[in-house]
Amino acid sequence: MATDGASCEPDLSRAPEDAAGAAAEAAKKEFDVDTLSKSELRMLLSVMEGELEARDLVIEALRARRKEVFIQERYGRFNLNDPFLALQRDYEAGAGDKEKKPVCTNPLSILEAVMAHCKKMQERMSAQLAAAESRQKKLEMEKLQLQALEQEHKKLAARLEEERGKNKQVVLMLVKECKQLSGKVIEEAQKLEDVMAKLEEEKKKTNELEEELSAEKRRSTEMEAQMEKQLSEFDTEREQLRAKLNREEAHTTDLKEEIDKMKKMIEQLKRGSDSKPSLSLPRKTKDRRLVSISVGTEGTVTRSVACQTDLVTESADHVKKLPLTMPVKPSTGSPLVSANAKGSVCTSATMARPGIDRQASHSDLIGSSVPAFPPPSANRIEENGPSTDSTPDPTSSTPPLPSNAAPPTTQTPGIAPQNSQAPPMHSLHSPCANASLHPGLNPRIQAARFRFQGNANDPDQNGNTTQSPPSRDMSPTSRDNLVAKQLARNTVTQALSRFTSPQAGAPSRPGAPPTGDVGTHPPVGRTSLKTHGVARVDRGNPPPIPPKKPGLSQTPSPPHPQLKVIIDSSRASNTGAKVDNKTVASPPSSLPQGNRVTNEDNLPKSSSPQLPPKPSIDLTVAPAGCTVSALATSQVGAWPAATPGLNQPACSDSSLVIPTTIAFCSSINPVSASSCRPGASDSLLVTASGWSPSLTPLLMSGGPAPLAGRPTLLQQAAAQGNVTLLSMLLNEEGLDINYSCEDGHSALYSAAKNGHTDCVRLLLSAEAQINAADKNGFTPLCAAAAQGHFECVELLIAYDANINHAADGGQTPLYLACKNENKECIKLLLEAGTNRSVKTTDGWTPVHAAVDTGNVDSLKLLMYHRIPACGNSFNEEESESGVFDLDGGEESPEGIFKPVVPADLINHANREGWTAAHIAASKGFKNCLEILCRHGGLEPERRDKCNRTVHDVATDDCKHLLENLNALKIPLRISVGEIEPSNCGSDDLECENTICALNIRKQTSWDDFSKAVSQALTNHFQAISSDGWWSLEDVTCNNTTDSNIGLSAASIRSITLGNVPWSVGQSFTQSPWDFMRKNKAEHITVLLSGPQEGCLSSVTYASMIPLQMMQNYLRLVEQYHNVIFHGPEGSLQDYIVHQLALCLKHRQMAAGFSCEIVRAEIDAGFSKEQLLDLFISSACLIPVKQSPSKKKIIIILENLEKSSLSELLRDFLAPLENRSTESPCTFQKGNGMSECYYFHENCFLMGTIAKACLQGSDLLVQQHFRWVQLRWDGEPMQGLLQRFLRRKVVNKFKGQAPSPCDPVCKIVDWALSVWRQLNSCLARLGTPEALLGPKYFLSCPVVPGHAQVTVKWMSKLWNGVIAPRVQEAILSRASVKRQPGFGQTTAKRHPSQGQQAVVKAALSILLNKAVLHGCPLPRAELDQHTADFKGGSFPLSIVSSYNSCNKKKGESGAWRKVNTSPRRKSGRFSLPTWNKPDLSTEGIKNKTISQLNYNRNVSLSKQKSLENDLSLTLNLDQRLSLGSDDEADLVKELQSMCSSKSESDISKIADSRDDLRMFDSSGNNPILSATINNLRMPVSQKEVSPLSSHQTTECSNSKSKTELGVSRVKSFLPVPRSKVTLCSQNTKRSSSSSNTRQIEINNNSKENWNLHKNEHLDKPNK
């Protein structure tokens, strides 16, 4: 007990301290209680509960044992172990209670304090327990929320994993695609490198070629100079030979004595020559045969034989290349010639020499490349090749082989046919083994000779005997006999005709029935292409004799012509053999000799009646009565051979299919004389064969048809159209008129099929079954409709035939009529109310059939023809057909009526899913497709079984049509904005121009639209800047102009679609098509960058001055500050200067400077003081004391030519050149004050002068300014008018440039040539002040169809501008020396009579040579307008015959030293006539008279003009009394212009294209004439040969131009005029008319050579 108490004592003693510490710790823990975790809170609660329980127990124990506790408390802590405790006990015991303080605290107080503390702690614990419970509840709620969040988290995690998997796959795919694309990029880069390498190689090659070309040009010029030299030597040699000839003629008197001896010798030679022709003539005849047969013309022997065999001499004209085909006559009775041999194909072909075989086959297969030389008398002679009239080419097909032999491949040039089963065919014309022919000749020539020698009197097919042509051996004069030529040509034609169908065996007896197997081989079938639409050309010969054919029936009959078929260019054939009609118009070189059977038309065919087939091929009826009808073809989708059909042969169980030929294996029943109405084509046979209508009755009358197993006479009579026999048989009793043969054909069927209307009427009257069908389900109406016998169809319909009867394949009569393009039958059936929508088993409708043939008329009838109202009879057919226009004209039914067929029928698809639109588009039948597209219900997006639309299968033309179905045509315009200022010569410049119309389709994207706009702009810029349809080489100068004006897509400032701005490359949400329709955009406007943007693109387009030159002008202004533009009046100087000033101003303002433009118009009264005030007021001239401002000043001085430059600008030249304060200049103002000024650095001075050149004192100003000369014969003025007028024409035609033959182009071309020729003549006259710029011609009206408007405008321009300027210039020149003191004004006011005459002559010459010449108006119409021109009635003979007697030598060019014309580049216009030697009066008159005498062979009108000129020379001095040398010089110049051959002949304006000869005064300008002579190109002898006799006479009688001088005036030595004449003829071929001035201009080197020649001629005169 004591131990326990002792052990507890220290704790009690420390209780107060622990209580205080515990309170602090409790305070801390209380603060951190919220942060305790769940486990810590539980532990805390358990500890506190333990303490509470322990204290409760202590309290209870202390209460129960209070005393013991007291004692223990007081004494229990003392023990013997601690001496200090004993001392304390003694201390306490030894003293009194009052004096001594207890060592420890009273236990009761301690207990009370502990109890109080425990109560507090219990309260706090209970509060914490309540807080812990509330937290526990929150914790539970948070646990639930956490679980929900965890579940959501799991779901999201799972979804995230799925997304990651998907993304991983996408990433893998993207990586794979990136790899592929990178590979492609590498490949494309490699390809690009290769292409660039190739481009570099091509560039190198082009550079090499250019170098070679330049070397060739140099070589050619050297050769031409050498040729000219040789020609002159030839002239000299000719004169020597002439002299020698005169000497030889002197000896003729001696030779007359020997005439008697020579006559005797001639008689002896004649007697000796009578015996020689028997030996020489056969060889000549043989050669003549070679010529006549091989070429068919009368050329030389060597040439003709070369054309026969040699392929080197191919003509460049593919149109005239005719294949040359000749048959080889097989040896009579030769067993080696097989029955199927065509053109004598030998079975023993191995015996032929390979050389001849290769040559023959190659020349036959490429026979079209052999040139033919037609004689001048015949326009078209094609005896050696296929034509519309001649017999077909035998090599155009390969003969079919028997069924046990493989078909031979079509021979191609250079490839030998290889066939393992059949013997090889080395040539279509291999010579037979036992044919005794000339071994060295071509087999075709041998065959032709054989035909000429043999069969001369063989009977032809009509039983007549043709008389053989006269032999060539009869007489040498027979070659000139026209009858012999005609007969020879007829013989060649007959030989070719026989060659097309050789006899395969002996003809069968007339009485024997035809058999289908006479020989060992089937007959020859043949096809040939015929050109469509070519009219029959009359060659002057009888029609070709038809080929011989054996009888085909039991009784002899007239021969049936070949089924020559005309392939319509808008459709293909439907007879099973699809002939590609594209090969008809192709060049012969690209067409193999053989029919190309199209294997691409994948269209199913139905077995329609095939007698005769639709006109598409040429069927030659084979001999021996063998059957030919059904066409087997390798075409995909064609009728199977076993399909039952009309006229199907019994022997065609397995039809022979040849890839590139057409095999025939069934009988064909020729059409007898049908009952068609007069005026229509009597039958397919006649219309297709090309025979003349006069032969039709003879050929087609009552001929029997092959009956092919018809056992009864009734069927024979019905098939042959024998009405008498048929009526007799019908009157017999017991005869079954409805009897059918094994094919199911009744008599009515046969009669309807062959078109015998009378027989049909008899049978129908005898109540024959009208709807009896054959084994294939075809009724008589089906047969008649298929063959096109519309009268039979009309009769059958009248007897209530079933018009909607469908055969086994579902073919109705309407379907068959559409399939065979029988328009009349279609019309009758439609009027009878037939059903248009009946479908065949293949799903084809009549619309499909009509479209498949490409017949537009049939399709229009189906779609638009309505059933007539009641009361309309068939007799009104003619009147209806007149109203019903099927040609698609303005009154076409589709323009008036709506289609009667529903949309379901138009969109109906056949078994393969093809609609009619699919068929039309795939075959390229654009007209049919267009008609289908007009139907509003057409669905062009309908897809077939292969998921293809109409557009997918269409040809290029049809694709274009489909794409433009709903296309919007929006005009594209170019705008240059407002042209400022308007008073600067810009009145004629247009602000807007329509360049084209853009087709915007539904599927057009914005990228495509952007490309289209850019391409349209580029094309337009190139079109207006290129030479285009102008051929102006005769009037343009030699310097080449840049073809590009510098504009491109980069010149665009903005584009507006209607009113919406748009830029290239920009895209909207809507497509362009929808955007245009929604915004109702009527036009697209392109605005070009202008001066406001600091660019000159709009200025370039408005004025047609190249952009590079405008930029160069701007650079000169910015660099030199002082620039003057000068040129002839009307050269747009003012416009150029103002546009440059605007551009410069906006550039300076964009750089941050203020800028101002100051204009000043200079006139005669403008003084130097006014100019000084202008400079000072505009701050250009600044006082020295004043500091300069940053303002930029642009001063424009206009019309400086009206003032004296030296007087006006003299004081300003020095300060303008040196603009600084260091070089000031003192100027005196108007008030008398003088001050020093200097020109501002920021001042730009520009001036304009309307003068071609400077003169006199004005030249002193020239070095102080930068001058820009605007020459009329150099850029930019030279091509400006051409480009401007071309743009004007394009704008007038809404962007479509017309053809060069259009009258608008011709009249604009004339206006352009007027400006050029006018300036050329004025420059030659030495009057540069009269030169005109292009400004006056910019207002040329362009009115299509009204050329008179332009001529009237030209007359007003001539009278108002040109004539006054020319008059003023001529007067000023004529009076420049005459009145030096008074100036020129007096002379202008009072011109002398001579000056007036000179002016009138000059105006008349200029009017005729420069203005009226080349006008495209007819002469009669031009004469009406000539009176409107001023000065056109002056007699030119006065000028042409004038000469000056008193003129001194050496003064011819004096006036030119003062009056300088524009500087000439490379001798341009430096005419050698200016330095020509003077001619005396006697020389000129003698020359005039001699020229008159030597030109008697010209026309009467020319003779009259020459006589008038001669008479006018008598009173020459009285009429022209000129008083000065300059006037005489001027007249001389006019005289040379009037007579020069380098200018137009003013006396023959209308006939200039036919005759280029000049006046009698053409010799007045000998040097110029010699120059023109020497500039002619040398002409070969071939070109000289066509000269007529009177031209040759003139060539021998004309005077030598080079020999004319003062010392040799009377020389009459002739000079060859062949060069002049032929060059004139060559000139007529070009568009230059008779103006050959280009020859002088374009040959500068030659002109220089002639100038030296002129100097040489001048020397003897001095």
Swiss-Prot record:
<feature type="region of interest" description="Disordered">
    <location>
        <begin position="1580"/>
        <end position="1602"/>
    </location>
</feature>
<keyword id="KW-0963">Cytoplasm</keyword>
<feature type="compositionally biased region" description="Polar residues">
    <location>
        <begin position="583"/>
        <end position="597"/>
    </location>
</feature>
<feature type="modified residue" description="Phosphoserine">
    <location>
        <position position="1524"/>
    </location>
</feature>
<keyword id="KW-0770">Synapse</keyword>
<feature type="compositionally biased region" description="Polar residues">
    <location>
        <begin position="1582"/>
        <end position="1599"/>
    </location>
</feature>
<keyword id="KW-0175">Coiled coil</keyword>
<dbReference type="Pfam" id="PF00023">
    <property type="entry name" value="Ank"/>
</dbReference>
<feature type="repeat" description="ANK 5">
    <location>
        <begin position="842"/>
        <end position="871"/>
    </location>
</feature>
<dbReference type="GO" id="GO:0015629">
    <property type="term" value="C:actin cytoskeleton"/>
</dbReference>
<dbReference type="GO" id="GO:0090443">
    <property type="term" value="C:FAR/SIN/STRIPAK complex"/>
</dbReference>
<feature type="compositionally biased region" description="Polar residues">
    <location>
        <begin position="1639"/>
        <end position="1648"/>
    </location>
</feature>
<keyword id="KW-0597">Phosphoprotein</keyword>
<feature type="modified residue" description="Asymmetric dimethylarginine">
    <location>
        <position position="498"/>
    </location>
</feature>
<dbReference type="Pfam" id="PF12796">
    <property type="entry name" value="Ank_2"/>
</dbReference>
<feature type="coiled-coil region">
    <location>
        <begin position="119"/>
        <end position="276"/>
    </location>
</feature>
<feature type="region of interest" description="Disordered">
    <location>
        <begin position="1"/>
        <end position="23"/>
    </location>
</feature>
<keyword id="KW-0966">Cell projection</keyword>
<dbReference type="GO" id="GO:0043197">
    <property type="term" value="C:dendritic spine"/>
</dbReference>
<feature type="compositionally biased region" description="Polar residues">
    <location>
        <begin position="411"/>
        <end position="422"/>
    </location>
</feature>
<keyword id="KW-0040">ANK repeat</keyword>
<dbReference type="InterPro" id="IPR050719">
    <property type="entry name" value="Cortactin-Actin_Reg"/>
</dbReference>
<feature type="compositionally biased region" description="Basic and acidic residues">
    <location>
        <begin position="1649"/>
        <end position="1662"/>
    </location>
</feature>
<keyword id="KW-0488">Methylation</keyword>
<comment type="subunit">
    <text>Interacts with CTTN/cortactin SH3 domain. Interacts with STRN, STRN4/zinedin and MOB4/phocein; this interactions mediate the association with the STRIPAK core complex and may regulate dendritic spine distribution of the STRIPAK complex in hippocampal neurons. Activation of glutamate receptors weakens the interaction with STRN and STRN4.</text>
</comment>
<feature type="compositionally biased region" description="Low complexity">
    <location>
        <begin position="386"/>
        <end position="396"/>
    </location>
</feature>
<feature type="repeat" description="ANK 4">
    <location>
        <begin position="809"/>
        <end position="838"/>
    </location>
</feature>
<feature type="compositionally biased region" description="Low complexity">
    <location>
        <begin position="1624"/>
        <end position="1638"/>
    </location>
</feature>
<feature type="region of interest" description="Disordered">
    <location>
        <begin position="361"/>
        <end position="440"/>
    </location>
</feature>
<dbReference type="GO" id="GO:0051721">
    <property type="term" value="F:protein phosphatase 2A binding"/>
</dbReference>
<feature type="repeat" description="ANK 6">
    <location>
        <begin position="912"/>
        <end position="942"/>
    </location>
</feature>
<dbReference type="GO" id="GO:0005938">
    <property type="term" value="C:cell cortex"/>
</dbReference>
<feature type="region of interest" description="Disordered">
    <location>
        <begin position="454"/>
        <end position="479"/>
    </location>
</feature>
<comment type="function">
    <text>Regulates the dendritic spine distribution of CTTN/cortactin in hippocampal neurons, and thus controls dendritic spinogenesis and dendritic spine maintenance. Associates with the striatin-interacting phosphatase and kinase (STRIPAK) core complex to regulate dendritic spine distribution of the STRIPAK complex in hippocampal neurons.</text>
</comment>
<feature type="region of interest" description="Disordered">
    <location>
        <begin position="1618"/>
        <end position="1662"/>
    </location>
</feature>
<protein>
    <recommendedName>
        <fullName>Cortactin-binding protein 2</fullName>
    </recommendedName>
</protein>
<feature type="repeat" description="ANK 3">
    <location>
        <begin position="776"/>
        <end position="805"/>
    </location>
</feature>
<dbReference type="Pfam" id="PF25408">
    <property type="entry name" value="AAA_lid_NAV1"/>
</dbReference>
<dbReference type="InterPro" id="IPR002110">
    <property type="entry name" value="Ankyrin_rpt"/>
</dbReference>
<feature type="region of interest" description="Disordered">
    <location>
        <begin position="498"/>
        <end position="618"/>
    </location>
</feature>
<feature type="region of interest" description="Disordered">
    <location>
        <begin position="1450"/>
        <end position="1474"/>
    </location>
</feature>
<dbReference type="InterPro" id="IPR036770">
    <property type="entry name" value="Ankyrin_rpt-contain_sf"/>
</dbReference>
